[in-house]
Amino acid sequence: MMAVEQMPKKDWYSILGADPSANISDLKQKYQKLILMYHPDKQSTDVPAGTVEECVQKFIEIDQAWKILGNEETKREYDLQRCEDDLRNVGPVDAQVYLEEMSWNEGDHSFYLSCRCGGKYSVSKDEAEEVSLISCDTCSLIIELLHYN
């Protein structure tokens, strides 16, 4: 399995023509439709060589997109990476905070920290292992989550 960090920065959802909120079933339908359309064996014999190569490349991209988005674990990793990339593009990190400095909310099993705006930064126990940036639920501030080694 390929680590998400090593994956090229492609929008696998747009390759499948899908919305990031699409469920696995919808993604599978889009994949199946596209894979049939671009499959090398389904191409007409009178198509120019350059067009055939483009179709093969598209076929490979569609297959890669499905390998990532069709698996719950790799999809989750990819979605988290997309979220972090989006946050990095929003603005600079306001503070660096160690997970151990955050408070624990037993009710929803998450760590949280109050923001200076009155909102809060929160991250679930599972996500805390994987994310490094957390946005405030009220304002645009972002913190970087650190872990003691």
From Swiss-Prot:
<comment type="function">
    <text>Stimulates the ATPase activity of several Hsp70-type chaperones. This ability is enhanced by iron-binding. The iron-bound form is redox-active and can function as electron carrier. Plays a role in the diphthamide biosynthesis, a post-translational modification of histidine which occurs in translation elongation factor 2 (EEF2) which can be ADP-ribosylated by diphtheria toxin and by Pseudomonas exotoxin A (Eta).</text>
</comment>
<dbReference type="GO" id="GO:0001671">
    <property type="term" value="F:ATPase activator activity"/>
</dbReference>
<keyword id="KW-0479">Metal-binding</keyword>
<keyword id="KW-0813">Transport</keyword>
<dbReference type="GO" id="GO:0005737">
    <property type="term" value="C:cytoplasm"/>
</dbReference>
<dbReference type="Pfam" id="PF05207">
    <property type="entry name" value="Zn_ribbon_CSL"/>
</dbReference>
<feature type="domain" description="J">
    <location>
        <begin position="11"/>
        <end position="82"/>
    </location>
</feature>
<dbReference type="GO" id="GO:0017183">
    <property type="term" value="P:protein histidyl modification to diphthamide"/>
</dbReference>
<keyword id="KW-0206">Cytoskeleton</keyword>
<keyword id="KW-0408">Iron</keyword>
<comment type="subunit">
    <text>Monomer and homooligomer. Iron binding promotes oligomerization.</text>
</comment>
<comment type="similarity">
    <text>Belongs to the DPH4 family.</text>
</comment>
<protein>
    <recommendedName>
        <fullName>DnaJ homolog subfamily C member 24</fullName>
    </recommendedName>
</protein>
<keyword id="KW-0862">Zinc</keyword>
<keyword id="KW-0963">Cytoplasm</keyword>
<feature type="binding site">
    <location>
        <position position="136"/>
    </location>
    <ligand>
        <name>Zn(2+)</name>
    </ligand>
</feature>
<dbReference type="InterPro" id="IPR001623">
    <property type="entry name" value="DnaJ_domain"/>
</dbReference>
<feature type="binding site">
    <location>
        <position position="115"/>
    </location>
    <ligand>
        <name>Zn(2+)</name>
    </ligand>
</feature>
<dbReference type="InterPro" id="IPR036869">
    <property type="entry name" value="J_dom_sf"/>
</dbReference>
<keyword id="KW-0249">Electron transport</keyword>
<feature type="binding site">
    <location>
        <position position="117"/>
    </location>
    <ligand>
        <name>Zn(2+)</name>
    </ligand>
</feature>
<dbReference type="GO" id="GO:0061077">
    <property type="term" value="P:chaperone-mediated protein folding"/>
</dbReference>
<dbReference type="GO" id="GO:0008198">
    <property type="term" value="F:ferrous iron binding"/>
</dbReference>
<comment type="pathway">
    <text>Protein modification; peptidyl-diphthamide biosynthesis.</text>
</comment>
<dbReference type="GO" id="GO:0008270">
    <property type="term" value="F:zinc ion binding"/>
</dbReference>
<dbReference type="InterPro" id="IPR036671">
    <property type="entry name" value="DPH_MB_sf"/>
</dbReference>
<feature type="binding site">
    <location>
        <position position="139"/>
    </location>
    <ligand>
        <name>Zn(2+)</name>
    </ligand>
</feature>
<dbReference type="InterPro" id="IPR007872">
    <property type="entry name" value="DPH_MB_dom"/>
</dbReference>
<dbReference type="GO" id="GO:0032781">
    <property type="term" value="P:positive regulation of ATP-dependent activity"/>
</dbReference>
<dbReference type="Pfam" id="PF00226">
    <property type="entry name" value="DnaJ"/>
</dbReference>
<feature type="domain" description="DPH-type MB">
    <location>
        <begin position="93"/>
        <end position="148"/>
    </location>
</feature>
<dbReference type="GO" id="GO:0015629">
    <property type="term" value="C:actin cytoskeleton"/>
</dbReference>
